[in-house]
Amino acid sequence: MSNYTSLINLCSELNRTLGVTSDIERENLIQSYYNQGLISYRQYYLLIVSVRRHEYINNMFVSMYSENW
């Protein structure tokens, strides 16, 4: 799976669970993607910050921070 695809899937799941699942569970999901090498440390850090701020992650994030371009 490419970094772009991984990031899209992860962001979709994070947005879907916003306000439904605890922040700890959402952070664990990000951690699991990072541990599998599916996202970079920079992406990991930015997503953790977004989760802690309870932000919706839009497509611009994926465009700006994907490793594929």
Task: Indicate residue ranges for each PLM-predicted region.
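Short acidic DE-rich linear segments
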Residues: 2, 64-69
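N-terminal acidic leader/helix
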Residues: 2-25
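Acidic, low-complexity, intrinsically disordered interaction modules
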Residues: 18-66
